[in-house]
Amino acid sequence: MAGRSGSTDEELLRAVKAIKILYQSNPYPPPEGTRQARRNRRRRWRARQRQISAISERILTAYLGRPAEPVPLQLPPLERLHLDCSEDSGTSGTQQPQGTETGVGRS
């Protein structure tokens, strides 16, 4: 990891290993039992997955000092955006030469 000192790399690896252990501690439930029992096990598994995800995010936030999500993309002002709705433009943005037709069964 370029630009980091060795001690912080080791701390990051420890954090990632802890997160990996958290996810490995909650395997997907077995497909046994009645439909209701399977549904309940999956519901509890999803709830534990949400908890693990929240804990993992807190671990990374504590280590990195910022959320794990990427920075939002900067978009240009709305005044500069426009849609081209002319009838003769192609549907996929590709232009075809004048006089040619596309479609199945046309000759």
UniProtKB/Swiss-Prot annotation:
Asymmetrically arginine dimethylated at one site by host PRMT6. Methylation impairs the RNA-binding activity and export of viral RNA from the nucleus to the cytoplasm. Phosphorylated by protein kinase CK2. Presence of, and maybe binding to the N-terminus of the regulatory beta subunit of CK2 is necessary for CK2-mediated Rev's phosphorylation. It comes from the Viruses. A motif (Nuclear export signal and binding to XPO1) lies at residues 73-84. Its main location: host cell. Gene3D superfamilies: 6.10.140.630. The keyword Phosphoprotein applies. Keywords: AIDS, Host cytoplasm, Host nucleus, Host-virus interaction, Methylation, mRNA transport, Phosphoprotein, RNA-binding, Transport. It is found in: Host nucleus, Host nucleolus; Host cytoplasm. Residues 18-26 are annotated as: Homomultimerization. Residues 24-48, 82-107 are annotated as: Disordered. GO terms for biological process: mRNA transport; viral process. Residues 36-48 have a biased composition (Basic residues). Residues 88-101 have a biased composition (Polar residues). The modification Phosphoserine is found at residues 5, 92. A motif (Nuclear localization signal and RNA-binding (RRE)) lies at residues 34-50. GO terms for molecular function: DNA-binding transcription factor activity; RNA binding. Belongs to the HIV-1 REV protein family. HIV-1 lineages are divided in three main groups, M (for Major), O (for Outlier), and N (for New, or Non-M, Non-O). The vast majority of strains found worldwide belong to the group M. Group O seems to be endemic to and largely confined to Cameroon and neighboring countries in West Central Africa, where these viruses represent a small minority of HIV-1 strains. The group N is represented by a limited number of isolates from Cameroonian persons. The group M is further subdivided in 9 clades or subtypes (A to D, F to H, J and K). The RNA-binding motif binds to the RRE, a 240 bp stem-and-loop structure present in incompletely spliced viral pre-mRNAs. This region also contains the NLS which mediates nuclear localization via KPNB1 binding and, when the N-terminal sequence is present, nucleolar targeting. These overlapping functions prevent Rev bound to RRE from undesirable return to the nucleus. When Rev binds the RRE, the NLS becomes masked while the NES remains accessible. The leucine-rich NES mediates binding to human XPO1. Homomultimer; when bound to the RRE. Multimeric assembly is essential for activity and may involve XPO1. Binds to human KPNB1, XPO1, TNPO1, RANBP5 and IPO7. Interacts with the viral Integrase. Interacts with human KHDRBS1. Interacts with human NAP1; this interaction decreases Rev multimerization and stimulates its activity. Interacts with human DEAD-box helicases DDX3 and DDX24; these interactions may serve for viral RNA export to the cytoplasm and packaging, respectively. This is Protein Rev. It comes from Human immunodeficiency virus type 1 group M subtype G (isolate SE6165). The gene is rev.
